């Protein structure tokens, strides 16, 4: 990646000189605020959010793993979603916390690529997993008598494995395509993590091919998963409308309400960030959108799936009784 040489008094960087150009070896992540007075406050806020997110998601994973009453397809998918959210927030938050307590805002080229790659793995995998969860809810509501046979252990495992495989393959294409670009100007990224949009803004090469490849990868994944979710929920809605009793309709809807909220939060923030025309591009708005799907969504998902879930509440109650010292 080629940068013209430039002087910087605020930051120092390690570059390799080749001819009259400089090969970049690191980026500078500005984060949320350059004001040093805000750094302790931001550190405290993000540390609190990080600890709550980790504890919430790992509690769900452990409960689903250890309680035999939660060994069902629905909770199998919820457990994998919680693991993804645990992974997602861990890709970004430690670097955010480190930048809040250190004046060194640098991230190596390899570190930037790794951060983009692993964030893409989680994002793409979650797209596929949410579609698989919609199919699970479709099978439970539309064909309840055949549900156990339809959502077999082999099928559930295959859907989750396929989600991860698709996530890794898409992430490889996304990351490799991004880092084939040449960048010009200062190596300063006005963001709190290495994401494709701010990197593309720094590119000094023609991004037409990049945009076509990225549109194909992102477009296929997002549109295909949204289409699968929409088809599932149209069938679910039709099945609910055929239920005669109000209590039956309420119970059927409540089984998929949490998933529907999670879908709207995740895809809403992604579409807000990536579907807007370039003329309306704003780094500040992108920071807010990125903060939502990288930090807020993983924080909210454990609450969404557990607050009104009697099975998880009961499993948590039994777990706390088990670990309490006998008196």
From Swiss-Prot:
<feature type="transmembrane region" description="Helical; Name=6">
    <location>
        <begin position="253"/>
        <end position="273"/>
    </location>
</feature>
<keyword id="KW-0297">G-protein coupled receptor</keyword>
<keyword id="KW-0325">Glycoprotein</keyword>
<keyword id="KW-0812">Transmembrane</keyword>
<feature type="topological domain" description="Extracellular">
    <location>
        <begin position="274"/>
        <end position="286"/>
    </location>
</feature>
<keyword id="KW-0472">Membrane</keyword>
<dbReference type="GO" id="GO:0004984">
    <property type="term" value="F:olfactory receptor activity"/>
</dbReference>
<protein>
    <recommendedName>
        <fullName>Olfactory receptor 9G4</fullName>
    </recommendedName>
</protein>
<keyword id="KW-0675">Receptor</keyword>
<keyword id="KW-1015">Disulfide bond</keyword>
<feature type="transmembrane region" description="Helical; Name=5">
    <location>
        <begin position="213"/>
        <end position="233"/>
    </location>
</feature>
<dbReference type="InterPro" id="IPR017452">
    <property type="entry name" value="GPCR_Rhodpsn_7TM"/>
</dbReference>
<feature type="transmembrane region" description="Helical; Name=2">
    <location>
        <begin position="72"/>
        <end position="92"/>
    </location>
</feature>
<comment type="function">
    <text>Odorant receptor.</text>
</comment>
<keyword id="KW-0716">Sensory transduction</keyword>
<dbReference type="GO" id="GO:0004930">
    <property type="term" value="F:G protein-coupled receptor activity"/>
</dbReference>
<feature type="topological domain" description="Extracellular">
    <location>
        <begin position="93"/>
        <end position="113"/>
    </location>
</feature>
<dbReference type="GO" id="GO:0005549">
    <property type="term" value="F:odorant binding"/>
</dbReference>
<dbReference type="GO" id="GO:0007608">
    <property type="term" value="P:sensory perception of smell"/>
</dbReference>
<feature type="topological domain" description="Cytoplasmic">
    <location>
        <begin position="308"/>
        <end position="327"/>
    </location>
</feature>
<feature type="topological domain" description="Extracellular">
    <location>
        <begin position="174"/>
        <end position="212"/>
    </location>
</feature>
<feature type="topological domain" description="Cytoplasmic">
    <location>
        <begin position="234"/>
        <end position="252"/>
    </location>
</feature>
<keyword id="KW-0807">Transducer</keyword>
<feature type="glycosylation site" description="N-linked (GlcNAc...) asparagine">
    <location>
        <position position="20"/>
    </location>
</feature>
<dbReference type="Pfam" id="PF13853">
    <property type="entry name" value="7tm_4"/>
</dbReference>
<dbReference type="GO" id="GO:0005886">
    <property type="term" value="C:plasma membrane"/>
</dbReference>
<feature type="transmembrane region" description="Helical; Name=3">
    <location>
        <begin position="114"/>
        <end position="134"/>
    </location>
</feature>
<keyword id="KW-1003">Cell membrane</keyword>
<feature type="transmembrane region" description="Helical; Name=4">
    <location>
        <begin position="153"/>
        <end position="173"/>
    </location>
</feature>
<keyword id="KW-0552">Olfaction</keyword>
<feature type="topological domain" description="Extracellular">
    <location>
        <begin position="1"/>
        <end position="43"/>
    </location>
</feature>
<feature type="transmembrane region" description="Helical; Name=7">
    <location>
        <begin position="287"/>
        <end position="307"/>
    </location>
</feature>
<comment type="similarity">
    <text>Belongs to the G-protein coupled receptor 1 family.</text>
</comment>
<feature type="topological domain" description="Cytoplasmic">
    <location>
        <begin position="65"/>
        <end position="71"/>
    </location>
</feature>
<feature type="disulfide bond">
    <location>
        <begin position="112"/>
        <end position="194"/>
    </location>
</feature>
<dbReference type="GO" id="GO:0007186">
    <property type="term" value="P:G protein-coupled receptor signaling pathway"/>
</dbReference>
<feature type="topological domain" description="Cytoplasmic">
    <location>
        <begin position="135"/>
        <end position="152"/>
    </location>
</feature>
<dbReference type="InterPro" id="IPR000725">
    <property type="entry name" value="Olfact_rcpt"/>
</dbReference>
<dbReference type="InterPro" id="IPR000276">
    <property type="entry name" value="GPCR_Rhodpsn"/>
</dbReference>
<keyword id="KW-1133">Transmembrane helix</keyword>
<feature type="transmembrane region" description="Helical; Name=1">
    <location>
        <begin position="44"/>
        <end position="64"/>
    </location>
</feature>
